[in-house]
Swiss-Prot record:
Belongs to the papillomaviridae E7 protein family. This is Protein E7. Residues 1-43 are annotated as: E7 terminal domain. It comes from Human papillomavirus 57. Keywords: Activator, DNA-binding, Early protein, G1/S host cell cycle checkpoint dysregulation by virus, Host cytoplasm, Host nucleus, Host-virus interaction, Inhibition of host innate immune response by virus, Inhibition of host interferon signaling pathway by virus, Interferon antiviral system evasion, Metal-binding, Modulation of host cell cycle by virus, Oncogene, Transcription, Transcription regulation, Viral immunoevasion, Zinc, Zinc-finger. The E7 terminal domain is an intrinsically disordered domain, whose flexibility and conformational transitions confer target adaptability to the oncoprotein. It allows adaptation to a variety of protein targets and exposes the PEST degradation sequence that regulates its turnover in the cell.
Length: 92
């Protein structure tokens, strides 16, 4: 469009065929027992977690890496919050 206001002369309509409507729902069905078997065989995700804490004797920084699942790292966190402490190699 050129000018300050649009006019009918500036508008061009391009009429094409209307696209065909396609049903996207699939009627394919799976055997549920096969899906359940595959799900049960997968192991829980294991990930590496970095743990930074202090030595209970000299209060120096101690860093370690553990590999475990999400539930296990939460359990480890609870142990640190309760009575579990780490001793650095120098204080052992």
């Amino acid at each position: 469009m050129h000018g300050e206001r649009p006019s009918l002369e500036d508008i061009t309509l391009i009429l094409e065929e209307i696209p065909e409507i396609v049903d996207l729902h699939c009627d394919e069905q799976f055997d549920n027992s096969e899906e359940d078997t595959n799900y049960q065989l997968t192991e829980p995700a294991v990930q590496a977690y970095g743990v930074v804490t202090t030595c209970c004797k000299c209060h120096s920084t101690v860093r370690l890496v553990v590999e475990c699942g999400a539930a296990d790292i939460r359990h480890l966190e609870q142990l640190f919050l309760n009575t579990l402490t780490i001793v650095c190699p120098r204080c052992v």
